């Protein structure tokens, strides 16, 4: 499976330059998981293939890549401490662990926001993307806001 973005693009889009994260710390598997779990259900295989083939560069650059990068960071974040050689959980105080858990929750919220942003853009411009079917987008049927499940 060819990915829409590279590990370096994930780092450039979602990490601040001063971090210790390098391209080798974000794996192709992290990106593939993010695309399979969070992108494909929203855009579908046909639009994914079109974007991978180089079509719809504005959609890819402005909406898809930031969303995939955010989900990739969310997926990779718990593993980054290990990959960067930072001490394991038992070496942290409970407060440090709570801060790390809060950071992961923030990453999830940010990724969800970018997913919704991309979905809203696709819905508003669905005539421009022949491969996109809004009826297949799960965000058009169900969402969880503040712990409340909304089904439409």
Language-model-derived ranges and their functions:
Residues 90-107:
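Short His/Asp/Glu-rich catalytic/ion-coordination signatures at enzyme active sites or charged loops
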């Amino acid at each position: 499976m060819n990915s829409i973005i590279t590990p370096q693009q994930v780092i450039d889009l979602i990490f601040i330059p001063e971090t210790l994260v390098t391209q080798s710390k974000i794996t192709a598997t992290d990106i593939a998981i993010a695309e399979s779990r969070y992108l494909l259900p929203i855009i579908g295989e046909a639009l994914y293939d079109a974007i991978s083939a180089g079509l719809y560069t504005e959609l890819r650059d402005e909406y898809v890549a930031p969303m995939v990068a955010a989900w990739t960071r969310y997926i990779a974040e718990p593993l980054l401490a290990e990959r960067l050689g930072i001490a394991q959980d038992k070496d942290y105080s409970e407060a440090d662990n709570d801060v790390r858990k809060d950071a992961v929750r923030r990453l999830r919220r940010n990724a969800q926001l970018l997913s919704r942003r991309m979905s809203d853009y696709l819905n508003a411009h669905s005539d421009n993307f022949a491969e996109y079917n809004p009826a297949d987008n799960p965000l058009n049927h169900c969402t969880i806001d503040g712990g409340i499940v909304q089904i439409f």
